[in-house]
Amino acid sequence: MPKQKTHSGLKKRIKITATGKLMRHQAYSNHLAASKTTKQNRQLSAETTVHATDAKRIKRLIANMK
């Protein structure tokens, strides 16, 4: 049986914390920033945790990542 490979796309987009949580960048923050308020742009720049319902599936795809 071949080894499970780490998903290359997720490897670049997800960061694992020391406690095992998955961190991701938020959507809607890359362009058209002039039409958003300063508060929106500031809050969107922060990383957020992956929702618990998605975490199990994502952890399976990046199982070999440390």
Curated annotation (Swiss-Prot):
Keywords: Ribonucleoprotein, Ribosomal protein
A GO CC term attached to the entry: cytosolic large ribosomal subunit
Keyword Metal-binding assigned: no
A Gene Ontology molecular function term of the record: structural constituent of ribosome
GO biological process, one term: translation
Pfam families (alphabetical): Ribosomal_L35p
PANTHER family membership: 54S RIBOSOMAL PROTEIN BL35M, LARGE RIBOSOMAL SUBUNIT PROTEIN BL35M
Family recorded in the similarity comment: Belongs to the bacterial ribosomal protein bL35 family.
Protein name per its UniProtKB record: Large ribosomal subunit protein bL35
Gene that this polypeptide is encoded by: rpmI
